[in-house]
Amino acid sequence: LNKEARHMGGHPYDGHTEIFATLTGTKTYAMMFYGPLKIMHVSTHCSLREACNRATKQRVLDVIRLLNQAMIQTGMEHPHLAVAGLNPHAGEHGLFGDEEIREIGPAIEEAKMEGIDVDGPIPPDSVFGKTLNGVYDAAVAMYHDQGHIAAKLQFMSQCVNCTIGLPIIRTSVDHGTAFDIAGKGIADGTNMKQAMLVAEEFMKNR
């Protein structure tokens, strides 16, 4: 799905996630990377300035709930989750920003009271490495590039884009349309195959 072409055609949606949410009347949903590193995003296609505004207690709590639900749907009975901070060093007790104190921390505490096994806020520069090494089963990223860079650095062909919270199963490849190689017979279908396999995995445990 080419974002530029879609906007040129007058369509307001930022991506698949927003389109399917509108079509299904879904209010609470999130984008998730599913692969060797499993990451769900608090915000996606918006400016970094706007991403900071969207890191509210309610939104972070909603995403923690959705991630917990998604992991259970894939057969994990008691997922152990991590939540990244928004600021360097997760704010360092308010020295580098107070979103962790005002919004993210309270969301985590409420999730814990609901019985969700979740830790954080954890400094963004270490949380994804810990998740990859098995300390956590999945992680919440605060914004698009925070999660995308971590996932794509090693696992570009294995990352599948999922929308969690919809009444349907939705997965897709995690790369663009690549118009520059269209018709040349050199496209790699590995990621498409992986997207189908992940959809099957969600379906088995639905």
How should these model regions be labeled?
Residues L1-E99, G105-R206:
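Anion-binding alpha/beta catalytic cores of soluble intermediary-metabolism enzymes, centered on
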